[in-house]
C-alpha cells in the first residue's frame, strides 16, 4: 500500500500505528492485530511531503496563475479567493469561471487543479499566499490536447523550457508554441 501525507498532518494514525513528527518517507511494516491471533502485516510505502508557501502577485489586470501547492491536501481555490478578497474580479479556466460581485464569488468553477493554468483578473495589485503540502509533479500528469492548453507549472523553482516540459508525455511538432503571459514565447523547430 502507498500513502502520501503532508508533514503538517503528522502525527498520523494508520490502523493501530501512529507516525510521529519525526517520521520520514520510507517503507514501514504496520501490524493490524486480529482477535483470532492471525495478525495482518502490511508494508506501507509512506511519502511525507514538505509544507510550503506560494506567494502570488497579481498586477491589477489579468494574470496567469498555477500552483505547486497540492490540491489534494489543500483547498487552493478557497485560499486563493480569500487572499484576493474584494480585489478579485474573475478566476477562469479554459472552460469555467467565477466572478466576484457584491461580496460573493459565483460561477461554475469550483476547484483549482495543479495540472491547469488559470487567468485571474483583479481590480488593483494584490498579493496572496497559499500554504500547504508541496505537490509532487509525478502525481499530477498533464494531458496535452490539440490546440491551446492552459498547463499548470507544478514546481517551486524556475526552469528553462526544455527542462520544464521534460516530464510531459508529448512529442513536440514543428511549429508548436509555448507562450508566457509576460516573458515571451518559444517555438519548436525540428532540426
Regions found by a protein language model. Give the residues of each.
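Proline- and Ser/Thr-rich low-complexity, intrinsically disordered segments
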Residues: 1-52
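N-terminal exported-region signature
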Residues: 49-191
Amino acid at each position: 500500500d502507498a500513502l502520501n501525507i503532508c508533514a503538517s498532518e503528522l502525527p498520523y494514525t494508520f490502523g493501530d500505528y501512529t507516525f510521529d513528527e519525526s517520521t520520514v518517507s520510507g517503507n514501514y511494516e504496520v501490524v493490524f492485530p486480529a482477535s483470532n491471533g492471525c495478525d495482518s502485516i502490511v508494508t506501507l510505502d509512506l511519502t511525507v511531503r514538505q509544507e510550503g508557501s506560494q506567494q502570488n502577485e497579481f498586477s491589477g489586470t489579468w494574470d496567469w496563475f498555477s500552483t505547486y501547492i497540492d490540491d489534494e491536501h489543500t483547498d487552493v481555490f478557497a485560499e486563493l479567493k480569500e487572499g484576493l478578497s474584494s480585489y478579485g474580479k474573475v478566476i477562469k479556466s479554459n472552460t469555467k469561471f467565477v466572478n466576484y460581485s457584491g461580496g460573493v464569488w459565483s460561477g461554475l468553477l469550483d476547484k483549482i487543479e495543479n495540472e491547469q493554468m488559470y487567468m485571474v483578473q483583479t481590480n488593483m495589485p494584490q498579493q496572496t499566499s497559499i500554504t500547504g503540502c508541496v505537490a509532487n509533479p509525478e502525481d499530477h500528469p498533464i494531458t496535452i490536447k490539440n490546440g491551446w492548453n492552459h498547463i499548470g507549472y507544478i514546481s517551486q523553482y524556475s526552469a528553462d523550457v526544455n527542462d520544464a516540459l521534460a516530464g510531459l508525455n508529448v512529442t513536440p511538432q514543428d511549429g508548436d508554441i509555448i507562450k508566457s503571459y509576460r516573458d515571451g514565447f518559444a517555438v519548436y523547430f525540428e532540426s
